[in-house]
Amino acid sequence: MKKLKHSILSLLLLMGACIVSCSNDDGQTSSTDPDEVGGESFTIPVSSLRLRDPFILVDKKTSMYYLHFNNNLKIRVYKSKDLSTWKDEGYSFIAKTDFWGQQDFWAPDVYEYEGRYYLFATFSNAGVKRGTSILVSDSPKGPFTPLVNKAITPSGWMCLDG
């Protein structure tokens, strides 16, 4: 029960930090108090996160939390063991030049299904305003690739969240 309360409190703090920050920077921060797990340093405190449209995947296979968020026309991922300190894992998705969506990267959600990871996100281009795409990876941190190179929602629909 204590662990559940701690997780809920940490999640609330994370969401509060995300709402307050809403910045356009790259999300990079640093700390002088690293938390080491299995040789990895989790040095980014939740209170310093500056990001938009976060989604947290609880991955039972790796016993980690994965935080995906949009970041300057890319999707970035952090991971944590406790929701309090985080490690920057880089980008989970960087669109190639032939990817249909070239603007408005928005609200990624990630789910595990039958051993693979699926990222749902909203993108736009000149002909499709806010269409949803599904991306797939064998890892919760990516890299994700498009299942199909087009929006899965009708072009007349405005889909705000993947």
Region locations from a protein language model:
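Carbohydrate-active catalytic/glycan-binding domains of CAZyme proteins
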Residues: 22-162
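Bacterial Sec-dependent N-terminal signal peptides
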Residues: 1-33
